[in-house]
Amino acid sequence: IKMIKKIYGKHIFYFTLFTVVLSATTLLTKNIFSFTNETITLFICLFLILSIGISHGALDNYKANKLLKIYSIKNKSIFFIIYIFISVLVIFVWSLYGTFTLLAFLLVASYHFGLEDTSFLHKGNSFLDQIFYLIKGSLIIFAPLFFHFDETLKIFETLMLSKAFLTFLEIEHWVINLCLFLSFIGYIYFAYKNKFDDFEVLFLDMLSILILNYIFSPIIAFTVYFCFLHSIRHIISL
């Protein structure tokens, strides 16, 4: 366990260093991405997500083996049939109920990010722990909303979030501020639960995410986080 924590500690240190250097370079060159065509930037981000980022999802096959052993299921095809069925079902429901499905997806994503990025420090499974996994992981959702509100709303609009909900976010901006504050509380909660051992890991985690979302557009910030922090952590955990 100590060795794993040491690996995670080195990883977050180098990731934060990479974030600071990339951000400083961007600021000093008056935004290094400003000269880049938006289409090219999106293509690069998509390439990174499909190559590095999705690779951690491809390892679901490894997790499937563990899950099938737990339930004593020998037929591996059952997992893939259910996996594909759920994926198709989500796309179908999304096309019918865009706002509901997107909000549900963001909730699940927040919980996933919170759980996967904390599990190496804390193994608790209480109901309160589950709530705080969700709260902590929501930083990935609310940081871009806080720093780049209009740009993030455009992304949500593309993903079929209703006009009514978009208007609600514009008028009730305090909701975003409150949720961002709560995500900080989530970090403090797990630091406390871990008796403030390895506190620097949680601090650098939060700091790097905030820096990325302050300096870069939501797409770039998420790509860097997803590919070089979250996905690599997931791979290490396996």
Regions of interest found by a model, annotated:
Residues 3-19:
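N-terminal membrane topogenic signal
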Residues 22-25, 82-91, 113, 203-212:
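Hydrophobic, membrane-inserted alpha-helices
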Residues 25-42:
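Short, hydrophobic transmembrane alpha-helix segments
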Residues 35-36, 65-75, 119-130, 189-203:
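Membrane-interface helix-boundary motifs at transmembrane edges
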Residues 69-73, 88-147, 157-164:
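Membrane-interface helix-loop-helix junctions at boundaries between adjacent transmembrane segments
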Residues 107-111, 116, 131-152, 172-190, ...:
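Alpha-helical transmembrane segments of multi-pass integral membrane proteins
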Residues 116, 225-238:
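Predominantly late transmembrane helices and immediately cytosolic-facing juxtamembrane segments
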Residues 162-175:
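Short aromatic-rich membrane-water interface segments that cap or initiate transmembrane helices
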